[in-house]
């Protein structure tokens, strides 16, 4: 009997250490909750201002814009000096003829304009790539934000479960001391608490990983502490499917870029056809004669692209450009079809997760909470077993986690849908 009492005292001491550790961790978590709130709109502004991927995309746009002037410009003029019949030994001033020339290559009218249009369409495509990168980064930021929320909420639920098991332990210990319960119930509570304590380091690591991803998108130190991510308030998506299709087809940057690619290839095709026309070279010359009168001269030269031995080259260029137009149009149609599919698919997934989250929030969680309270009252009154109480507690915890996972999955799908459609569908954004 004395050994039995010592064993019970040792068990209580161990439980005290575990509970003290749990309470200390819980206090740390409460302190983290009291930090500044992490607001999604402010983070979106930050990622659009600082993310290096976006900085690089904007610089690529700037570079592409500067290619337009280059494409529209003439080649450099050529300054030449010719010496004819220079006496020996070499004396340049006594050459019979010294010719100073200035020449300029002139493409056939319209060629430079078409080259500029091709470069302009390429620059416009790069601009749309910037807008697409902005949407992509906002989507990734939202998903990282809600991943962080899920891990913070998981840790909060973990500490709530520790507190709940502490209460179960106190009930079991009180019943055991009064001779109305079994020491096995006390030991079961100890085991459950130990299992929870083992889970905490893994949860903390996952929270740090989620925070590091968010900081990386914001171009900050991955280990920088973050505030508390806010729980989303899911609102129904009221826009009809046809309206979402119309918005995406009109505003999606990738589709605008595809249309610009068609235009660019059409301009390239027109330029290839213009290669059948000759280019020119004009020159102005000044003649200085050693023992004769000085004078001026000029000439005009013309290329012959329609010679039978060069024309096949230009024929192939036109055929290549025509194939490029066909490819661009096919890719545009493919992207339009993909956009419609993505909207249908994401909207269906979004509504499915909405239904799941609503079912948990309105039915499963209230029922599980009632079941837990009933099991606790029944065990305290001696009408239920401790194992039933533990099973009910596990179910309650699992249902909470599944609810928040469904909620976060819903926000992931919403972010992806907003990326495709091109407008915010969530007021919190």
Roles of regions detected by a PLM:
Residues 45-55, 62-77, 89-92, 100-117, ...:
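A glycine-/polar-enriched beta->alpha junction
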Residues 117-120, 183-191, 386-393:
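Short, charged, amphipathic alpha-helical segments
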Residues 2-6, 26-32, 402-429:
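Acidic, low-complexity, intrinsically disordered peripheral segments
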Residues 11-21:
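Bacterial N-terminal signal peptides
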Residues 56-71, 133, 137-157, 166-169, ...:
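Amphipathic alpha-helical coiled-coil segments
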Residues 94-98, 294-298:
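Residues that define the transmembrane beta-barrel architecture of outer-membrane proteins
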């Amino acid at each position: 009997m004395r050994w039995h009492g010592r064993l019970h005292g040792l068990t209580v001491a161990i439980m005290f250490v575990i509970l003290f550790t749990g309470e200390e961790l819980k206090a740390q978590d409460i302190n983290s909750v009291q930090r500044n709130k992490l607001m999604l709109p402010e983070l979106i502004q930050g990622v659009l201002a600082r993310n290096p991927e976006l900085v690089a995309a904007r610089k690529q746009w700037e570079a592409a814009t500067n290619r337009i002037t280059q494409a529209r410009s003439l080649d450099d003029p050529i300054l030449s000096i010719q010496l004819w019949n220079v006496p020996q030994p070499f004396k340049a001033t006594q050459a019979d003829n010294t010719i100073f020339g200035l020449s300029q290559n002139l493409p056939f009218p319209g060629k430079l304009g078409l080259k500029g249009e091709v470069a302009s369409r390429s620059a416009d495509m790069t601009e749309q790539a910037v807008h697409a990168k902005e949407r992509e980064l906002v989507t990734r930021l939202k998903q990282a934000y809600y991943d962080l929320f899920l891990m913070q909420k998981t840790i909060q639920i973990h500490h709530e479960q520790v507190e709940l098991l502490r209460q179960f332990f106190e009930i079991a210990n009180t019943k055991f001391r009064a001779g109305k319960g079994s020491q096995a119930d006390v030991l079961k509570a100890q085991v459950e608490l130990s299992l929870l304590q083992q889970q905490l380091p893994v949860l903390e690591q996952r929270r740090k990983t989620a925070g590091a991803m968010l900081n990386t998108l914001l171009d900050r130190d991955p280990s920088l502490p973050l505030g508390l991510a806010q729980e989303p308030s899911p609102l129904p998506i009221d826009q009809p499917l046809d309206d979402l299709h119309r918005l995406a087809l009109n505003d999606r940057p990738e589709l605008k870029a595809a249309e610009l690619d068609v235009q660019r290839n059409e301009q390239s095709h027109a330029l290839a056809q213009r290669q059948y026309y000759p280019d020119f070279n004009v020159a102005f010359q000044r003649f200085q004669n050693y023992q004769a009168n000085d004078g001026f001269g000029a000439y005009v030269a013309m290329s012959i692209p329609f010679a039978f031995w060069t024309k096949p080259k230009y024929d192939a260029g036109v055929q290549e450009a025509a194939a490029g137009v066909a490819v661009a149009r096919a890719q545009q149609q493919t992207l339009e079809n993909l956009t419609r599919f993505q909207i249908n698919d994401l909207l269906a997934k979004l509504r499915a997760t909405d239904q799941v989250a609503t079912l948990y929030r309105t039915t499963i969680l209230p029922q599980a909470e009632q079941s837990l309270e009933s099991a606790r009252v029944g065990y305290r009154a001696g009408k239920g077993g401790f194992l039933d109480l533990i099973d009910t507690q596990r179910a309650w915890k699992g249902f909470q986690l599944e609810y928040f996972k469904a909620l976060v999955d819903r926000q992931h799908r919403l972010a992806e849908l907003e990326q495709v459609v091109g407008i915010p569908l969530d007021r919190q954004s």
